[in-house]
Amino acid sequence: MEKALCLSWRMGALPGHVEVSREGKAALTVTTGEASVSCSIFFAGKEKPLVLEAAAKAEEKIALRFLPARLELWVGDALADEEWPFGECLYRGETPHPAVTVAEEERAEAPAPAVTGTFTHAAGWRPGGGVYVGDCMPFVHDGRYHVLYLKDRRRHHSKWGLGAHQWAHISTGDGVTWQQHPMAVEITDPMEGSICTGSWARIGGTQYLYYTVRRSDGSAAPIRRSVSRDGYHFTKDEAFAFTLSDRYDGPSARDPKVFPGPEGELHMILTTTRKDSGRGCLAHLVSRDGERWREEAEPMYTSPSAEQPECPDYVAFAGRYYLFYSIRGVAHYLYSDGPFGPWQVPREPTVPCARVPKAAVWRDRLVFAGFLPEEDFLRYAGTMTFKAASAAPDGQLVFEDWEM
């Protein structure tokens, strides 16, 4: 049961601007235009408010909901915008105008079905409603190609720039028709600034999602996980959390990739920085059971500069091993005859798939998924994009468009 404080009114019932103040400072403002509504919620110690906005027609019902870890703006029966709070909210439930109803709600959410919707052709797709596709994390299970992706609003500017990303989930059996599944990992605690990129792993009969959580207070990012039996409904494992040792920069640790080793052990690589040299790297950890992890003496890869190799990926493919990472959104790869190197640099080391793509082996090819910004390439999030690759006899990848 989830409790919410709900403010509701009809478009046209309020003057253009109403405000609730506390100790001489704005706590809540609601601004309405002919076809729009904007709500600003203020917090102690924050210079800027969280702002939720939506288009709305005359007489439509507007609802602003305050939940412990989320703010929602509804227009009619549609969720139009979201934000994610942290800290002391200055608004305490006062009525901003006689036309506004303020009430407490209790919402019992039934488990979502495994398939919540369908669509065709994921290339160029995004969910709509102000939601964009961020980093993609593909995997293959039971013959289906799955993509977990960061659900993005405001191009990484939600929650005062922390991102407030959550994991959404789609899959396909033929590359044409796609199913939408329940949210895989959501923000459920105000201390969670963003659920960062990670990876899927199957250990025994259980499926896991490994990820780091960017902390709202800037402290070291813990490595966390969620657990599922059916692969569609995941639950956070609240007992599982650890951080890297002080050899590495803890707050920047992110993007764990978990994969099986040649002797049945599990390996994890993740983005961070070596404190001794200041160079970006992929820290390397090993586990026998997925529960207890130990750091290897050396990273899997160390960058020649301070730039961090982001969104790492590791794939065994066509008799060789491939290590991927992204620099400024552009993916690079290395390959080796052995599982952990020595790594060779291909003649053309970049992956021609925007941005920060990761891959899974499906139908004898590597199929990459990434995101393509709709305007400025350097702006975060956009629509989903794909690329496929096969391996040449010498191990270098040959890329092609992915079309079904």
Regions picked out by a protein language model, each given a short descriptive name:
Residues 2-6, 10-13, 17, 38, ...:
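Carbohydrate-active catalytic/glycan-binding domains of CAZyme proteins
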Residues 17-41:
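Glycan-recognition/cleft segments
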